[in-house]
Amino acid sequence: MKRLTYLLCFALGTLTSCGASAARTAPEPEKAQSSDTPRTPTVRASDEAIQKYFASTLIDQKGALPASTLPLEDIKKARTQVWRLWAEANKSLSEDKLPALTPLSKESVAHSWLLTPEKYNGESFKAVMPFYYGSKGDKPEAGYPLYLYLHGSGEKKGEWSTGLALALSFQDSPSAYFIPQIPNGEGVADGQLYRWWQKSKLEVWEKLLRQAFLSDQIDPKRIYFFGISEGGYGSQRLASYYADYLAGAGPMAGGEPLINAPVENLQHVAFSLRTGYNDTQFHRSELTGYTRDALQRLAAQYPGYYKHFIDIIPKYGHAIPYQHTTPYLSQHVRTPQPKQVNWEDYPIDGLYRKGCYNLAPLKRPEGKERIYYQENILGNTVDLKINTVKYVEKKVSDWYTSFHLVLLYDKVYEPAKGGKLRIYLSPELLDLSKPVRVLVNGQQVYSGMVKTDWSHLVESCSRFFDPERLFPAAIDIAY
């Protein structure tokens, strides 16, 4: 396996706000104050205005956001309307589309997507990602569970074909599979582009999720990422980063330092990690143990959360039995709008998330790379703890001396200052007909009624592209 480079990673580029006629821009952050009862409903934002906004966000342009007061009793109908318009905008977008879902077999036809060119040491490399996309069994009423399988870092064509064979063998039917081949593998850029978490690949996972959610073939509450070896590293990192989209994740024969994949983010993700006891290269089995220990502590601290199945398998090395992961994952369903959220916001390959669950950073504190949000909604009170995170080296590998591999860190938290945050709200999270309180680090920053508006439905749709997270209300706070 190629030498690992443990880089901090990721933050996907989500969609920005964009234009429409007869519209206003998104509201400025609100200060702690009492608000009036929402005004009498006016004419809602037009379909044309919403479609223009969506069309603009899909090509990463900015503009005015359609806005109009939304009565509480119309939220369900409005969500349906907004999602329909989002689907129409995506259909009109000129881009590679997911192919029709056909039965997965040894003869499955390969498809491909053109990626953003990849860069290494000042050079640019064309990136084309071949993939298989197919189903097993009869489609459930809610749609197929979707598995993204990431292969290891051997000869990439052989690894890819092995991935297809494994997908066919796993006992997880009914299911759908997206099985990609790494665009630039061995022999290119010293192997340093053989990573599943780099920018061009992150754009693909965004696109896959967005298009899968629009498909009537895929269950949006049952998305799973898993992989083997290099694919194990990738799926562990992506699980922490994409936690709000996933029902489960299952890296195998991997094991990441937790700075690359903070376990705090896995509160609502069923997480399986299986590594051979004798798989000591790059400290894989040791790092798997540290992940197990951290999840055990969190599961004890938060009963009912942080479900995990971590196995350091006696007598096995890098090759292990692979058949146990997807049956475990398939038992779990995503929680898209939890009332309790732990989220460490961090960059991967220089990119930050634009939001997670119902939280969206509008401004990060200057000079602070990582922010840890802890949200607890009890009744109509949103209680937030917002802290900066500093990693302090605790244990460094004494085996690998040609590069600096930190195995364990201590974390130091301090109250964060100088940031702005958008908190999306919905009937699933609290009672929008009653006043809402927001606390940040024990201080009240908002108290009053929250106005429901078409603008929030539209903006949250373009930000998260998730049918389970169309938020009709939001509060912007400064801390």
PLM feature segments, named:
Residues 248-330:
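The feature captures the conserved acid-bearing segment of alpha/beta-hydrolase catalytic domains
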Residues 9-16:
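Bacterial N-terminal signal peptides
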Residues 142-146, 172-177, 219-223, 243-248, ...:
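Loop/turn elements at helix/coil->beta-strand transitions in domains of secreted/extracellular proteins
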Residues 143-213:
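Active-site machinery of serine-nucleophile hydrolases
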Residues 2-9, 290:
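Sec-dependent signal peptide recognition
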Residues 18, 23-144, 433, 446-449, ...:
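A domain-start/cap signature at the N-terminus of enzymes
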Residues 35-65, 297-479:
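Alpha/beta-hydrolase-fold serine-hydrolase catalytic core, especially in secreted/extracellular enzymes
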Residues 214, 221-267:
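Primarily recognizes the serine-hydrolase "nucleophile elbow" in alpha/beta-hydrolase
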